[in-house]
Amino acid sequence: MIRDNPCGTLDQVKFRRGKSRGVRPKVLAGNWKMHKTQQEAVAFLQEFLGELVDTPSDREVVLCVPYTCLSVLSKSLHGTRVKLGAQNVHWADQGAFTGEISPPMLVELGVRYVIIGHSERRQYFGETDATVNQRLRAAQSHGLTPILCVGETKAQRAAGETENHIFQQLALDLVDVDQTNLVIAYEPIWAIGTGDTCEETEANRVIGLIRSQLHNPDVPIQYGGSVNANNIDAIMAQPEIDGVLVGGASLQPQSFGRIVNYKPL
């Protein structure tokens, strides 16, 4: 369990797994990244909703879309089972932060989920564990559910540093974060957008290790990394995996529909 004052090094932080209280929800989220105009987003949704007619009710379906699509999709999603998500959020409610979007702005648009700490944000835009933590706490303070992304690079995996790196991310990212309103996505960075998928059993092993570091073992933990219609059934057959964070395969209604309608093996 992440204890008080977990701001120091990993060996200063004590972890203990809590007791599970029940069945974890399945959260299937699409991350459109920097794709789709408003017109394209509406056209996608019109077709995608038809894919959900027989989707089991215990599956949470989320679309994390560009800021420019939030308003139009908020109106279009009203009354449907699809939840609206954003791809980032600032930690301040307002201020001189050119180009940023605040939690109240997202809430006003009906956003329910927000991705925080995606590897592309960390790699290309200088996100750190400190700023990730600020964003997590700000999002939760306004009732948003964060999807926290953690994962290792190819070099870290080759060096045997996968566990230490992810544990350090968790120790720093989750300071004062409410684990009852949280989703975590394990994204092996070397598998994102590369077509290389982490073996399902290995993803299950790492996600189990992530869960062992949480004081709430019922936090849903997703897998993200080249998820597609062909591998979703095998991924979701793993007992520790509670959903997926899907990139490219979420851009087409049929492929994302197949993913949310995965068939348990």
From Swiss-Prot:
Q: Which residues form a coiled coil?
A: none
Entry keyword Cytoplasm: yes
Cellular compartments per GO CC = cytosol
Kindly report, in one word, the top-level EC class recorded for this enzyme: isomerase
- Keywords annotated in UniProt: Cytoplasm, Gluconeogenesis, Glycolysis, Isomerase
Q: Which CDD domains match?
A: TIM
What PROSITE patterns does UniProt report for this protein, alphabetically? TIM_1 (PS00171), TIM_2 (PS51440)
A GO MF annotation of the entry reads: triose-phosphate isomerase activity
The pathway to which it is assigned is: Carbohydrate biosynthesis; gluconeogenesis; Carbohydrate degradation; glycolysis; D-glyceraldehyde 3-phosphate from glycerone phosphate: step 1/1
InterPro entries documented for this protein = Aldolase_TIM, TIM_sf, TrioseP_Isoase_bac/euk, Triosephosphate_isomerase, Triosephosphate_isomerase_AS
Q: Which residues form the active site?
A: 118 (electrophile), 187 (proton acceptor)
Q: Where does substrate bind?
A: 31-33, 193, 226, 247-248
Where in the cell does this protein reside?
A: Cytoplasm
A GO biological process held by the record:
glycolytic process
Name the reaction it catalyses.
D-glyceraldehyde 3-phosphate = dihydroxyacetone phosphate
Q: How does it assemble?
A: Homodimer.
According to its UniProt entry, what is the function of this protein? Involved in the gluconeogenesis. Catalyzes stereospecifically the conversion of dihydroxyacetone phosphate (DHAP) to D-glyceraldehyde-3-phosphate (G3P).
Q: Which family does it belong to?
A: Belongs to the triosephosphate isomerase family.
What's the protein called, per UniProt?
Triosephosphate isomerase
Q: Which gene encodes it?
A: tpiA
